[in-house]
């Protein structure tokens, strides 16, 4: 079995012992990477349940990590790693090929590296050929869209809020945008719809 795993996400990387072949994807440190001080809660190691430390984060819960107890960590560099990220020019390199960045948000870097990894390993599409598709790539509508209306730019982000990290990452993206802005947060309560999954016989 071949697994494509995020090299910088501790839970995903912990599956590396379950496959004959692991293809890792990730992103190197870039201008939007950040550190947290000791007052922030960190996640438990998925292998030994002790504290994981991050050298830096590329997104909340994703970055260069190591468990000091069991040694669980990402490789120094993923097999498919986004490097030389330039958010202003909207460019990055991956396996020596320059790519245009359709969406200049840090969390998309992992989608880009995963897509190139799957394209080459699964479909035989070389990175230089995959780079051509990035020129016309459009994200699925409704998740992250940039709209223009009456001279204003509207950046619409919708998240499923599976965990606090997804909300925090979205807030980080908004905060890192230096443009003057108005922010509207619409939070929907998460309700437990037990009748949809419980045995009701």
Where are the language model's segments positioned?
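Short beta-strand segments
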Residues: 6, 26, 184-188
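A conserved, hydrophobic alpha-helical segment in the catalytic core
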Residues: 62-75, 103-135
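Short, charged/polar "capping" segments at the starts of alpha-helices
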Residues: 9-14, 31-33, 191-196
């Amino acid at each position: 079995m071949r697994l494509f795993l995020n090299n910088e996400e501790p839970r995903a990387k912990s599956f590396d012992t379950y496959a004959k072949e692991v293809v890792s994807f990730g992103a190197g440190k870039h201008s939007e990477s950040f550190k947290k001080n000791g007052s922030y809660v960190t996640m438990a190691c998925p292998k030994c349940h002790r504290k994981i430390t991050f050298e830096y984060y590329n997104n909340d819960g994703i970055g260069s990590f190591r468990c000091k107890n069991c040694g669980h960590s990402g490789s120094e560099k993923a097999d498919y790693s986004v490097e030389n990220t330039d958010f202003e020019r909207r460019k990055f390199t991956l396996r020596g090929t320059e790519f245009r960045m359709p969406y200049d948000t840090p969390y998309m870097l992992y989608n880009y590296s995963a897509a190139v990894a799957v394209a080459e390993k699964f479909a035989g599409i070389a990175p230089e050929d995959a780079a051509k598709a990035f020129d016309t790539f459009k994200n699925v509508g409704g998740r992250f869209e940039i709209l223009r209306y009456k001279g204003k730019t509207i950046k619409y982000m919708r998240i499923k809020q599976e965990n606090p990290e997804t909300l925090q990452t979205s807030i980080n993206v908004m905060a890192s945008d230096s443009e003057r802005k108005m922010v509207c947060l619409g939070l929907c309560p998460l309700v437990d719809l037990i009748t949809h999954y419980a045995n009701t016989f």
